[in-house]
UniProtKB/Swiss-Prot annotation:
Belongs to the AIR synthase family. This is Phosphoribosylformylglycinamidine cyclo-ligase. It is found in: Cytoplasm. One of its GO terms (cellular component) is cytosol. It comes from Staphylococcus carnosus (strain TM300). CDD domains: PurM.
Length: 345
């Protein structure tokens, strides 16, 4: 029967091998609240061990987008899983939730155990760094759905926060300040444009881009995980709103965390722009304003705090080895929910 299934495009033995290869990676992400092990029909997590009075569950799901295509084309699969984790846990973190567990979904033309192991290694690396248990997942072999060598990767994360500590941005008010946490690079958005510019420029991706790092490694630098530094701030500073700067850049994401009646005023000269964005802008002849509508431009996550807490917040983030800047302030509402100052043509 296995041979018949294999002839139809599904190799169950390759699937078994992939599972065996990923077990050691998954195991290092486990938390004491996880019940049982791999292989069940469902994964269980004991919320009572969190010792929360009124726990609110927060969930998020996302993928990596066409950054995957760049990784696949250059046979580099060991960090793309970090991106999948980051895109989900950074999102739920904006509510003040601590990520608890993660599930991944890999769909592929053909299960190649070595490749699946590398993908799951990256997922496990991201989970381990954020103390998030990788409690389940699915690997689907669908030869008629994907071209040879191709796969898609998505994830689902669940976190928890005390109901009284849930952050939704509703109490943001004028006079508060915005703290920006540095990104690690492009993160996981805008890659349809990035790949187009790579192709048009005919750049040698193995050539050095900056400080001994190749173009390829620069473009595939994993999305930064903000969980540990932000939770460290949350323990000592009252946070009013948080934003994960993803697709749509500053213009689409920062207003999502603000109530009616206020405007976020951002000084783009208050933080450095990584060289990779300068390269993209030059190669694509892109207007500066549009760059902030596509990319994170060097700031991957923002916090809104009281002005009196700004220095303390920056100090905590420095202790967490995260570059951070006071990038703006909350003002009375103007015509737009966000205004960027210092933008050069």
């Amino acid at each position: 029967m296995a041979e018949s299934y294999k002839n139809a495009g599904v190799d169950i033995h390759a699937g078994y091998e992939a599972v065996e290869r990923m077990k050691s990676h998954v195991q290092r992400t486990m938390r004491k609240e996880v019940l049982g092990g791999l292989g069940g029909f469902g994964a269980a997590f004991d919320l009572s061990q969190l010792n929360m009075q009124k726990p609110v569950l927060v969930s998020g799901t996302d993928g990596v987008g066409t950054k995957l295509k760049l990784a696949i084309d250059h046979d580099k699969h060991d960090t793309i899983g970090i991106d999948a984790v980051a895109m989900c846990v950074n999102d739920i973190l904006t509510t003040g939730a601590e990520p608890l567990y993660f599930l991944d979904y890999i769909a592929t033309n053909k299960v190649v155990p070595e490749v699946i192991e590398q993908i799951v290694k990256g997922v496990s690396d991201g989970c381990e760094e954020t103390n998030t248990a990788l409690i389940g997942g699915e690997t689907a072999e669908m030869g008629e759905m994907y071209h040879e060598g191709e796969y898609d990767l998505a994830g689902f994360a669940v976190g928890a926060v005390e109901k009284d500590d849930y952050i939704d941005g509703s109490t943001v008010k004028p006079g508060q300040v915005i703290i920006g946490l540095a990104s690690s690079g492009i993160h996981s958005n805008g890659y349809s444009l990035v790949r187009h510019l790579i192709k048009a420029s005919e750049v040698d991706l193995n050539a050095e881009f900056e400080n001994g790092k190749s173009y390829l490694d620069t473009f595939l630098e994993p999305t930064r995980l903000y969980v540990k530094p932000v939770l460290a701030v949350k323990e000592q500073v009252k946070l009013y709103a948080m934003t994960h700067i993803t697709g749509g850049g500053f213009y689409e994401n920062i207003p999502r965390a603000l109530p009616e009646g206020v405007t976020a005023e951002i000084d783009v000269q208050s933080f450095p722009t990584p060289a990779v964005f300068d390269w993209l802008q030059k190669e694509g002849n892109i207007e500066t304003e549009e760059m902030y509508n596509i990319f994170n431009m060097g700031i991957g996550f923002t916090l809104v705090v009281d002005e009196a807490e700004a220095e303390k917040t920056l100090s905590i983030l420095k202790e967490q080895n995260v570059d951070a800047y006071q990038i703006g302030k909350i003002t009375e509402a103007s015509d737009e929910p966000i205004v960027l100052t210092g933008v050069k043509a």
